[in-house]
Structure formats: structure tokens, C-alpha cells
Amino acid sequence: MFGCLVAGRLVQTDAQQVAEDKFVFNLPDYESINHVVVFMLGTVPFPERMGGSVYFSYPDQSGMPVWTLLGFITNEKPSAIFKISGLKSGEGSQHPFGTMNIPQTPSVAQIGISVELLEQMAQQTPVANAAVSTIDSFTQFTQKMLDNFYNFATSFAVSQAQMTPNPSEVFIPSNVVLKWYENFQRRMAQNPFFWKT
């Protein structure tokens, strides 16, 4: 029903079913993991009006599991990417896995999926710094890249009087770079995926 993927590792599709509506994936050597992808395999959909709350668990200093709500997957949104690198300290949150005796070793974390009503899931608040990756992070990266390129290119600006004639060099007027920069920003604001066409 579910799959779990960590970069550089094989896809896991062998979730351990710990209750009728609860599934767990083990993540060995979790200390080196930054992001995890949780997805539905497409073989069995959630029952109507149901979805999956996705939790991350790591052992605290005493070896007890600390569970944190990452987010959700549903039939309409069957996959999600979660950042877990900043979650390996601090306190957990309320979770449905607390009363279960799920074995956990010191360097193994777990991803838990709890099948719940969509209405119940909507009332839960995932931890903020595990936010599912969205287009906003891509847009933010693109904006930083544009700013960096424009600042770098204009740092070499010289006036026409300062130019040394060199037939092997090609010069681009800074107003052309500025025009490109503004056009790219405008197009990104209208459609963040325009560059794919």
C-alpha cells in the first residue's frame, strides 16, 4: 500500500503493519538522512474519506521513541517529500503510535503512517520545519539565483570610457542583463514552470 524512499537507498515497500490502520518503515542510520519521500504504491487506495498521517520517530537519549507529525498523504495527493534533518532534537507531538510496543534500535528511526479520517487529519498540525516541499522553495531558489547572477554580472560593469579595446572580448550592455532579469522574474511570477516549455 505504501512506499518510502531515501536518496541513495533502495525503495522500501515492506512496511510493517503494527495495527489494522498503522504501518511503520525502519530507517537505519537515520542520522545521515535529510529528506524522505512517502508515497502510495497505487495498488490499494485509501477508503473513502480516509488518508494517512505521516509521522517520524527517532530514539531519544534514553532510547525511547520520539514521534513527530510530518504531514499527510491522500488519494488526491498520494506522495509527499518531508525534511527530517532538523527534527532529530527536541520534543515530539501527539501521535497514535505511543501505546504500541514497536521495537526500535538506537540508530534506527521510523516513519509511521496512520490511516485516519480526513476530517481528523485536517485538525492536526504538522511540525513546521518538516514542511512538504512546495513550489515556493523552487521559486525562492530561482529568485536567489537570479539575484546572484545579476549582482555578479554587474560587479564587472565599467563605463564606455573605462573600456580597453579588445577584439576578442564581447561586451553586453548592463541594461540588457537588467531587462532579461526583469522578464525572467515576471515570467516566474506568472508561471513557475514556464521554463519547462
UniProtKB/Swiss-Prot annotation:
Superkingdom classification of source: Eukaryota
Keywords: Cytoplasm, Nucleus, Protein transport, Transport
GO terms of biological process kind: cellular response to heat; protein import into nucleus; protein transport
Tagged with keyword Transport: yes
Transmembrane segments: none
Pfam families membership: Hikeshi-like_C, Hikeshi-like_N
GO molecular function annotations of the record: Hsp70 protein binding
Gene Ontology, cellular component aspect: cytosol; nucleus
Keyword flag Cytoplasm: yes
Location in or out of the cell: Cytoplasm, Cytosol; Nucleus
Database matches in InterPro entries: Hikeshi-like_C, Hikeshi-like_N, OPI10
Function: Acts as a specific nuclear import carrier for hsp70 proteins following heat-shock stress: acts by mediating the nucleoporin-dependent translocation of ATP-bound hsp70 proteins into the nucleus. hsp70 proteins import is required to protect cells from heat shock damages.
Family: Belongs to the OPI10 family.
Full protein name: Protein Hikeshi
Organism whose genome encodes this protein: Xenopus tropicalis (Western clawed frog)
